[in-house]
Amino acid sequence: GASCARALHAEGLAVTLVEPDSAYFACPFSNAVIAGLRDMEAQRFTLDGLRRAGIAVVPRRAVAVEPRRVVLADGAALAWDRLVLAPGIELRFDALPGYDEAAAEVMPHAWRAGPQTALLRRQLEAMADGGTVVMAVPANPYRCPPGPYERACLIAHYLKTRKPRSKLIVLDAKDQFSKQRLFEQAWARLYPGIIEHVPLSGGGRVTGADAATRTLTTEFGTHRADVANVIPPQRAGAIAAAAG
């Protein structure tokens, strides 16, 4: 949304950005934070640069879209000639039995950068050498298709360099994934014996979660984790549905 606002403003258009948060943590490079290669604060950005560029920033949440009007959470409305929706994602906590927002505080998704990113990093740091990390990767569609496999590489790097007796199991609800050949080559060359990828055809689809025991259930059995990273199914943010 911010990039679109900048590009349109550069063409001389009057642009208003509606955004409830005064700052945000960027997802790109957040996997490096999880692996201890980047500081969390480096991911934090404010909207001050947009304001300095002359873009009007309205610190509210948009809740409805009407013909030529956007309705805000406080009841105010903004008129528009052209409307761009940048809804982001909504995590579907109703899609995986046993995995809700409370469970995410034990088995973080870290698919929205910020506190969840820091939580997953702390859990990896606290895990004993020889522990097992289990990732659950959803079926398509979801934000950033290669992201889980990039994360697998970086977690494996952390384990290889800090906790070499540990392993990572990737439970995947797909048989094919983005940039698969490149990732598999990297796993074989850089992290042999560390990453075990379980595809859909091998029983990789996670069907349930138990936060109390950090256990993930698949159609073929269960996996007990010392650290569990559960990436749930997703959909477009609520404003997309509200807009019709």
Predicted region positions:
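Glycine-rich beta-alpha-beta "Rossmann" dinucleotide-binding loop(s) and their flanking helix/strand
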Residues: 83, 87-115, 218-244
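Short, hinge-like loop/turn segments at secondary-structure boundaries
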Residues: 32-36, 102, 186-188
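Beta1-alpha1 glycine-rich phosphate/pyrophosphate-binding loop at the start
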Residues: 1-56, 139-181
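A conserved beta-strand/loop capping segment in the N-terminal third of enzymes
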Residues: 51-98, 131
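Flexible, charged surface loops at secondary-structure boundaries
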Residues: 9-10, 126-129, 222-224
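A Rossmann-like FAD-binding core segment of flavoenzymes
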Residues: 53-71, 78, 157-244
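Glycine-rich dinucleotide-binding loop and its adjacent helix/turn
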Residues: 87-162
